[in-house]
Amino acid sequence: MSPLALVSVSDKKHIVPFCMELVEQFNYRILSSGGTAKHLIEANIPVIKVADFTNSPEILGGRVKTLHPKIHGGILAKRTDEEHKRDIEANDLELIDLVVVNLYPFKKTVEQGSKWEDSIENIDIGGPSMIRSAAKNHKDVSVLVDPSQYQNFLEESKKGELKDSYKAQLALEAFQHTADYDTAISNWISKERGLQSSKYIESYPLINTLRYGENPHQKALWYGLSNIGWNSAEQLQGKDLSYNNLLDLESALSTVLEFGYAEKDELTTDTFASVILKHNNPCGASISNSASQAFLNALECDSVSAFGGIVAFNSNVDSETAINLKDIFLECVVAPSFDAEALEILKIKKNLRILKLSKDQLPKKKQTSTKSIMGGLLVQDTNDSEDKTESWMSVTKNNPSNQMNLDLNFAWKICKHVKSNAIVIAKDQKTIGIGAGQMNRVGAAKIALQAAGKLCSDAVLASDGFFPFADTVELANEYGIKAIIQPGGSLRDQESIDMCNSKGISMVITQKRHFLH
């Protein structure tokens, strides 16, 4: 008897030409139900309806269609097992050779904000059962769960009997498909009902095999959600992104987006932001009245470290900005858009990776961040909650001036993205010195203050953590710093406040720490 394919798909892309070739080239009979059967019949493809095949009607509003011994027996039966052969004959089962199933669009349903009841109805039961049955019996049954697999299956079939290794690969992809589906459902229930899960489960498809990891001897893979975030970015030029590129791009964009997207129809003075980043630390940042000026201001902070760095913008890149960018060696430039003339200028630098990532391509605010440790995983809320200035306290006799308040706010936002211990010196809405990743706070302050030098006069200082002693304030005074912003919370806060008062320095305490490791 000719082979039998069970076809039940929510995503009907390519299903008609695929089934047509199954019938015409390989003499398959098609077994189907519901919307898939209707779709194939309308395309003049002969279909055996599941209800006729099982002699059982669909019940419970379509909740039960394929959950039947004639379906699962035909899929799970081992062709060479004598006991199975007897059961097949005794129960009048017909063997199913190919299962083509993809599932109700649960993720899409919940992303659209559907009601609880509607989302529940989009939890597929029969589909995963058929997929798992076929994957378990992959020695005898092939299983396809995605339209992207159809063409390869046809090509492999033309070669003759399918190889065991190929069928095992299909089974692997099938189990990953159902695992991903179950993960989406469990995470949705946890989120919707505010329930704490006893297991941390996430599912990300493979995006790309990277050339190597942080170092050439380390293997690296890129997993991610499709059509969102960096996976959806349009790369306009340059080699494939590396592991380090992706880490730096993420940090650069996260930093520049502290100032929001400067959309073309919403541009106002001081909304243009640019950040230059190297080795996961900002080495320059600014907001100004144009993208070009913001970049030049950021570059002034540390032009040496900017060499080979990443540049991020929160606004369109025009030709003037591109002219300034082309004079320095950079790994990547990312922005929400580029003028045509700007692209022509930038593309002269053949090795420059140019990425376009617009506001609507960003994921919703991340819920958690993770770090692997030996034998486990640390999970925390991401540090992306908005800092509310209403909770900030001016704790010194002198209050910051209006300009100083602007600079304190700016420096605080940048400091959040600098590795701890972090100190940022800023003036006129641009960084002039950054001290990153030091084991003590005064050491980070020395680096930042020395980098800024004479520019420190009337500048502001931001610290990601509190001052355990007054030594950082004393050092800041020597360089002419006039205002400081820090979380507070030290047992010796008063010592630092007293030092500020004695030197005429303003101090603002935010009551929120921004460590970054």
Curated annotation (Swiss-Prot):
EC number in record: 2.1.2.3, 3.5.4.10
CDD domains: IMPCH
Gene Ontology biological-process entries: 'de novo' IMP biosynthetic process
Keyword line: Hydrolase, Multifunctional enzyme, Purine biosynthesis, Transferase
SUPFAM superfamilies: Cytidine deaminase-like, Methylglyoxal synthase-like
The MGS-like domain, residue ranges: 1-145
GO molecular function, one term: IMP cyclohydrolase activity
Gene Ontology CC terms: cytosol
InterPro entries on file: AICAR_Tfase_dup_dom_sf, Cytidine_deaminase-like, MGS-like_dom, MGS-like_dom_sf, PurH-like
Superkingdom: Bacteria
Swiss-Prot/TrEMBL catalytic activity: (6R)-10-formyltetrahydrofolate + 5-amino-1-(5-phospho-beta-D-ribosyl)imidazole-4-carboxamide = 5-formamido-1-(5-phospho-D-ribosyl)imidazole-4-carboxamide + (6S)-5,6,7,8-tetrahydrofolate; IMP + H2O = 5-formamido-1-(5-phospho-D-ribosyl)imidazole-4-carboxamide
Pathway entry: Purine metabolism; IMP biosynthesis via de novo pathway; 5-formamido-1-(5-phospho-D-ribosyl)imidazole-4-carboxamide from 5-amino-1-(5-phospho-D-ribosyl)imidazole-4-carboxamide (10-formyl THF route): step 1/1; Purine metabolism; IMP biosynthesis via de novo pathway; IMP from 5-formamido-1-(5-phospho-D-ribosyl)imidazole-4-carboxamide: step 1/1
Recorded family membership: Belongs to the PurH family.
Free-text domain note: The IMP cyclohydrolase activity resides in the N-terminal region.
Matches recorded under NCBIfam families: PRK00881.1, purH
Protein name: Bifunctional purine biosynthesis protein PurH
Organism of this sequence: Prochlorococcus marinus (strain MIT 9312)
